[in-house]
């Protein structure tokens, strides 16, 4: 079973405010709106959504946990503000991979993120970030613009970033965006904006101001 409003959310979701929602996540992908939002065949729009003081308690090792969507496929996110505490409920380090303040995993048909802002704190294992945990190799041409994260990001493994944890898909575009939270992991590949990025991508008019620490000591930016 999925811990979300919808198992899979398709279509349009607009003009909604959430106050202090709480999710408990075990072994399945999860997000406040959907375990998965969008699909290859159904373009989906999430617009003008505010989430205040979301709490996600993770007590399992699901792949893909996000503030709004565990997984995003072919989604246009715009005009979104989200504050959240996404945490290790049992304090035992058994937490999911691919955890993002907004989206855990972006896959297949690329998604777009415009005027999206996240804040709070987030914990995960590998591929953890304030906005998108993991952009999968089969999801090229993802766009992030006019967006920011003020989330403090902490990971037990590698590939940790202020905005994006691991961008495996090529032709990523990030512009007019920034991160101000701290980024820390116990592995390698930690970045103020992006933990690790593959292929041909474009980063323009972006900055990060938070402290960055990778305790293994390699590939810090």
Describe the role of every protein-language-model region.
Residues 1-221:
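Predominantly extracellular beta-rich ligand-binding scaffolds that present long acidic/polar faces
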């Amino acid at each position: 079973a999925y811990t979300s409003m919808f198992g899979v959310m398709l279509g349009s979701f607009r003009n909604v405010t959430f106050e202090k929602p709480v999710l408990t996540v075990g072994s399945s992908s999860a997000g406040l709106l959907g375990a998965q939002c969008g699909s290859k065949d159904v373009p989906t729009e999430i617009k003008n959504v505010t989430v205040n003081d979301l709490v996600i308690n993770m007590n399992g090792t699901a792949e893909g946990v996000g503030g709004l969507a565990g997984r995003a496929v072919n989604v246009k996110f715009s005009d979104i503000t989200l504050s959240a505490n996404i945490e290790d409920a049992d304090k035992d380090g058994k937490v999911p991979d691919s955890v993002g303040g907004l989206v855990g995993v972006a896959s297949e048909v690329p998604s777009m993120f415009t005027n999206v802002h996240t804040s709070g704190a987030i914990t995960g294992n590998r591929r953890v970030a304030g906005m998108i945990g993991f952009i999968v190799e089969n999801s090229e041409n993802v766009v992030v613009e006019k967006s920011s994260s003020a989330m403090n990001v902490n990971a037990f493994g590698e590939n940790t970033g202020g905005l994006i944890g691991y961008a495996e898909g090529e032709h990523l575009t990030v512009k007019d965006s920034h991160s101000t939270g701290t980024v820390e992991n116990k592995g390698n590949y930690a970045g103020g904006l992006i933990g690790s990025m593959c292929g041909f991508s474009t980063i323009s008019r972006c900055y990060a101001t938070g402290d960055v620490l990778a305790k293994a000591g390699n590939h810090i930016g």
